[in-house]
Amino acid sequence: MEPSEVPSQISKDNFLEVPNLSDSLCEDEEVTFQPGFSPQPSRRGSDSSEDIYLDTPSSGTRRVSFADSFGFNLVSVKEFDCWELPSASTTFDLGTDIFHTEEYVLAPLFDLPSSKEDLMQQLQIQKAILESTESLLGSTSIKGIIRVLNVSFEKLVYVRMSLDDWQTHYDILAEYVPNSCDGETDQFSFKIVLVPPYQKDGSKVEFCIRYETSVGTFWSNNNGTNYTFICQKKEQEPEPVKPWKEVPNRQIKGCLKVKSSKEESSVTSEENNFENPKNTDTYIPTIICSHEDKEDLEASNRNVKDVNREHDEHNEKELELMINQHLIRTRSTASRDERNTFSTDPVNFPNKAEGLEKKQIHGEICTDLFQRSLSPSSSAESSVKGDFYCNEKYSSGDDCTHQPSEETTSNMGEIKPSLGDTSSDELVQLHTGSKEVLDDNANPAHGNGTVQIPCPSSDQLMAGNLNKKHEGGAKNIEVKDLGCLRRDFHSDTSACLKESTEEGSSKEDYYGNGKDDEEQRIYLGVNEKQRKNFQTILHDQERKMGNPKISVAGIGASNRDLATLLSEHTAIPTRAITADVSHSPRTNLSWEEAVLTPEHHHLTSEGSALGGITGQVCSSRTGNVLRNDYLFQVEEKSGGINSEDQDNSPQHKQSWNVLESQGKSRENKTNITEHIKGQTDCEDVWGKRDNTRSLKATTEELFTCQETVCCELSSLADHGITEKAEAGTAYIIKTTSESTPESMSAREKAIIAKLPQETARSDRPIEVKETAFDPHEGRNDDSHYTLCQRDTVGVIYDNDFEKESRLGICNVRVDEMEKEETMSMYNPRKTHDREKCGTGNITSVEESSWVITEYQKATSKLDLQLGMLPTDKTVFSENRDLRQVQELSKKTDSDAIVHSAFNSDTNRAPQNSSPFSKHHTEISVSTNEQAIAVENAVTTMASQPISTKSENICNSTREIQGIEKHPYPESKPEEVSRSSGIVTSGSRKERCIGQIFQTEEYSVEKSLGPMILINKPLENMEEARHENEGLVSSGQSLYTSGEKESDSSASTSLPVEESQAQGNESLFSKYTNSKIPYFLLFLIFLITVYHYDLMIGLTFYVLSLSWLSWEEGRQKESVKKK
């Protein structure tokens, strides 16, 4: 404190006149602790505690004492410095101590009923009882609940209490507790408060309960001992003292102005920022309450501060270094990823365009196109999803490991799904036949070394992986097939193609490795989402590589996208994409199969159900892989052959390319041909469907397979049905996959519907096309039906028509068909080729019956055959057209047509590939006549003219086309070359019948892919036209017409071609014109799907197709009437 002299000096100048007593009083106030008789000390004492915490910032307070308070005039004014005030804290502490010492509690000295049963038992006796009591904390008050027996409506409850052993007592009225009546009892509450005079240790509070009712008064006094509470001093004072000591640590910091408190808060924030709490926590100072001087406390705080600062700086430096390193690594990896890889995972790499641009800049697109770069944030999750990213994957520890594009492997079997191993994805480097040269960024040098592995597309790899997972045998087969394909591919393809395949293989490997079922599903969605990206990538790659094949490979890698893009690519000007599209019908199917297969494993189930043969199942996948390879090959071939035609009829070209490429692959590998046989039936048709509808090709493919089988069977069925044709009933079999693609084949059901006699009455086979939409596929069943539509050519034949040997199918015996099936089963390649090339009706019947046996039952073969014929629902005027076509076919010699078809096929085939021509030549035996002879020979029914064979081919055309696409492609190159001209006329005839081939080139294109050497030109043409109509309705007519072309080209003979050339040309022009709206509509559908929603686009597309089909049917009917 300041000495008293200061106020005394001030008083002389500033104080009013005061008696001498005032000075002494003032001094006493300063020296002594503010005597109690003065009112100021109490105020000052009360304010002192506040001043300590609240008034400390102020410079000082002015206190005024008035003389009138002492009975005098105003005496003096004193000023006190704030630092003097803390002396009053002693009184505050004393006050708190006194307050705590005065706390009392009431403790009960009785026991309440422990259970409700006891309570009710006593209540029945005493009529009123104390149910519960509650002592309010911090005060000497009690709240109790009394339960009374409801003996009367009017009742009063009192609590009589005494504090002096009943010398005196008080009655307290208890209040009714609302909503406490349970019909038998009521509750009343009361409250007893012990006021301070009675708050002393040892005081007793006794009470009893009086229950007054109309019946009487009842008492409850705890069985004569009264309810007693005793007042006890609260002994828990030390406990609050401990927390008080702990709390003051903070308070004292504030009082002492410990600067470290702010620093500590900053330290904690820094800890949060740097995530290193352990280090900083150890340095948090603990201030112990003590009587140290301010200076000591400040010094200690400063020391703590310094230590914290040093430690924090050190931690900051370390953290900064760590963060910088991490950022550098992530940036470098991200940049490499962006440069080198294209993010197929939408989550991982939002800027796909950047990846594409960087790829284009660095020329690394070739191998790295489908490698995905992971953003640092996606790290482990994205890496897990991608199984392996060609570039470093980000593990949970932010360690990035780039998987070089070497992962692209020729051997799918070596592909390792590295889903779970994000950090070990580096190990998932696929072994390629030739090693890629990696640049500094672990990216394959664009020009250094190209992987010469014609690896299947990512879908193929996916199929391979699926085969690995779900088909041990299929896996090996795929690998073998890939090896064969690779050999063919290398031999056939140029270095650029190798690069493209390399690129595709890297993509495929990338997908294959990373694609487990989940990933495949993911890519399926991703690819759909990234269709634009893939298209752009493909175009860019084509620009860079100069090889549309590369784009094809890219598309192969994005098969699922292609599945969606197939139609788009058909519209896309790039030939490579077109080639992709051309091969994509199957490859897309296979891709989608691979994509869907991981989801549903439907390839295996599909293949097993369809072919019932693992070989075929494997081939379905391997076929897909092979198809992808074929696609690459086809891309090469189509690069030269299809370049002109692709723009015109991309879908037909696609089918042709697929067939051609598949033919090569089969030619390369017999096993592949065997697998492809089943696959071709399913997958080729599937590919067609895929072309029509890229999204859900597998189910449609399955449908197509069955339909194809049905079509083949239809020729068989025609044999039986023709006999029954007089009955005037035709059967329409509609195959539908009821559910997911995985069990499509198994679930495919043939719906056999009797056609009205009106439909069956025609002398010509009535071709009823069913335009159905596959709810599961989200596509028109037409797409796959169209594949079978050719088969549906003449389902119902009158006996006369059957007599005409043109319906060789009708004449074909089921036994022969079964034999052929057996042959095809045992010798799938040869038999298949025969069937496709010229095995004639029996072969097609074989295939149909065989396929049916595989897919369905032999018993249902006839029905399926019949049904498949009408499968294309487009009844429209097609039946009439069929009649006309049949008439045309009758007019034309199927033998001649077959010759021309074989000639055109063989002539055109060389363009495609020698292997195809060889195989086809073997199958077709030789030139047109030889092919016809072979057909007759193969067709045990030699008596039946080639027209029958051609008709059978027409019926089985879809099957064969689907099947031939694999087997024929081998044999077709030559045949196609032969039939380039003949097929054109044949296809024209067929188109006159219904399919109307475009030009020899167009028919050759299709014949190259699915050329069916033996086809009934007339019936095929009829079927083709009807089927084309159905296809037009389903939007698949282009592709089916391609198949039909091949079929008809195989079956039609030159004389017939000449006779029907003009009619075919007119029909072709009409057909082309009729298909243009569908193509445009499909493009609109793709655009709508991209910009809006799949369901919206699909609905619009379906409605538009239905309307167009209806209009076209009306037009045809009007023409027929004329």
UniProtKB/Swiss-Prot annotation:
Q: Which residues cross the membrane?
A: 1078-1098
Q: Where is this region: Disordered?
A: 32-58, 332-351, 395-422, 496-516, 640-668, 963-983, 1025-1058
What's the PTM story here? Phosphorylation at Ser-46 by ISPK stimulates the dephosphorylation of glycogen synthase and phosphorylase kinase.
Keyword entries, A-Z:
Carbohydrate metabolism, Diabetes mellitus, Disease variant, Glycogen metabolism, Membrane, Phosphoprotein, Transmembrane, Transmembrane helix
Quick one: effect of changing residue 905 to Y? Probable risk factor for insulin resistance
Q: Where in the cell is it found?
A: Membrane
CBM21 domain location = 122-230
Membrane topology, from the record: Single-pass membrane protein
* Tissue localization of expression: Skeletal muscle and heart.
Q: Would you tell me the Gene Ontology cellular component terms?
A: membrane; protein phosphatase type 1 complex
Q: What InterPro entries does UniProt report for this protein, alphabetically?
A: CBM21_dom (IPR005036), CBM21_dom_sf (IPR038175), PP1_regulatory_subunit_3 (IPR050782)
Matching CDD domains: PBD_PPP1R3A
- Database matches in Gene3D superfamilies: Carbohydrate binding type-21 domain
- Where does it primarily localize? membrane
Q: Which PROSITE patterns match?
A: CBM21
- Record field: compositional bias (Polar residues): 640-662, 1031-1040, 1048-1058
Q: Where is this motif: PP1-binding motif?
A: 62-65
Q: Which residues carry this modification: Phosphoserine?
A: 38, 42, 46, 49, 65, 844
So which disease is it linked with?
A: Type 2 diabetes mellitus: A multifactorial disorder of glucose homeostasis caused by a lack of sensitivity to insulin. Affected individuals usually have an obese body habitus and manifestations of a metabolic syndrome characterized by diabetes, insulin resistance, hypertension and hypertriglyceridemia. The disease results in long-term complications that affect the eyes, kidneys, nerves, and blood vessels.
| Its job | Seems to act as a glycogen-targeting subunit for PP1. PP1 is essential for cell division, and participates in the regulation of glycogen metabolism, muscle contractility and protein synthesis. Plays an important role in glycogen synthesis but is not essential for insulin activation of glycogen synthase.
Q: What is known of its domains?
A: The CBM21 domain is known to be involved in the localization to glycogen and is characteristic of some regulatory subunit of phosphatase complexes.
| Assembly, per entry | Interacts with PPP1CC catalytic subunit of PP1, and associates with glycogen.
Q: What is this protein called?
A: Protein phosphatase 1 regulatory subunit 3A
UniProt lists the gene as: PPP1R3A
